[in-house]
Amino acid sequence: MTEQILERTKAQQYNFNKLQKRIRRNTGQAIADFNMIEDGDRIMVCLSGGKDSFTMLDILMSLQKSAPISFSLVAVNLDQKQPGFPAHVLPEYLESLGVEYKIVEEDTYSIVQDKIPEGKTTCSLCSRLRRGILYRTAKELGATKIALGHHRDDILETLFLNMFYGGKMKGMPPKLVSDNGEHVVIRPLAYCREKDIIKYSDMAGYPIIPCNLCGSQPNLQRQNIKQMLNDWDKRFPGRIETMFRAMQNVVPSHLADFELFDFKSINKDSGVINGGDIGFDKEEMPVATVEDEDMVQEFDPSLKLDVTNI
C-alpha cells in the first residue's frame, strides 16, 4: 500500500510538471509575441480568487525567476463586499507566497444590486465599476502594466459573442490601452487552454473563491457560447485550435469591410490578391494539432518515474 501511494504521488507530480511546462511555454510565447512585459515593468496582477488569476500569478512568478529581463509583480484583489466573501483567504495565501500585494475594499456589490433589476445580468455594470477601481489602483501603485487572467477560450468566446450578438468580427485583444487611455492592459494567458488551467488549478490546490454574482446567473450569452465551443471541441478535436489560429491569420481582402481594405480601387491591373477567388484554402492549411493531453494514470503501481529531473 505504501509503495502504491508513493507511485501515485510521483504520477501526480509528473502530471503537474507537464502541465506547468505547457502553460509556462504558452504564456512565455504570448508575452514575446505581443511584447507584453519589458525590462523594468511593474506588473499589477489582478487577482479575483478564481482559477485563471491564481494560475496567472503562479506562472508569472515562475517566469520572473528565469526571464532575461527584470520586472516586478504586485497582486491586487478587489474586495467588492459580496455577502459571505472570505476576506482572510487571499491575504493569507499571498503572505505565504511572499509576493507584494494590496487588497482594495470597495462596496460595488451594493451598487450593482441597487441599480440592476432582479433577474437581469449584473456583469456589465460590475465590470465597469471594477475596471475604474483597478485603473485608479494601478496609478496609485505606479504599475506600468495591468495583467488580466483571460485565456484562449475567453478570447474565442468573445469573438463569437460579437459575431452572434454584435455584428462584429471583434475578439479580446491580448494587449491594449485601457479605456481611460492611461494604462497598458495585458493578457499573458492568451495562448493557454482553459482545460489546462482547470487541471493545473486543481493540482495546485489554490484556495478558489467563487463569484456569487457572475457565476450564479443562468442562461448568460457567454455561457451559451462556451457550451457551444466545448461541444465542438469534443466532437471535432482540433477545431478550437484552428479557429484561434484563424484569429492570427486574418485576410482583409477576403472579408467585406471596405474600411479595412480598399476594394474600390481594385481593377484588372491590380493583379491577383491573396489567391484571388479561391474561397477555401483547405489544401494549403496545415493540419491542426491538439497538444498532448495524456496524463499518467495516478493509480498504476508499476509506474516508475524520476521526477527530480523533470
Curated annotation (Swiss-Prot):
Catalytic activity: cytidine(32) in tRNA + S-sulfanyl-L-cysteinyl-[cysteine desulfurase] + AH2 + ATP = 2-thiocytidine(32) in tRNA + L-cysteinyl-[cysteine desulfurase] + A + AMP + diphosphate + H(+)
Binding site for [4Fe-4S] cluster: C123, C126, C214
CDD domains listed in its UniProt record: TtcA-like (cd24138)
Biological process annotations from GO: tRNA thio-modification
Location relative to the cell: Cytoplasm
Family of this protein: Belongs to the TtcA family.
Subunit structure: Homodimer.
Described purpose of this protein according to its UniProt entry: Catalyzes the ATP-dependent 2-thiolation of cytidine in position 32 of tRNA, to form 2-thiocytidine (s(2)C32). The sulfur atoms are provided by the cysteine/cysteine desulfurase (IscS) system.
Protein name listed in UniProt: tRNA-cytidine(32) 2-sulfurtransferase
Native source organism of the sequence: Vibrio vulnificus (strain YJ016)
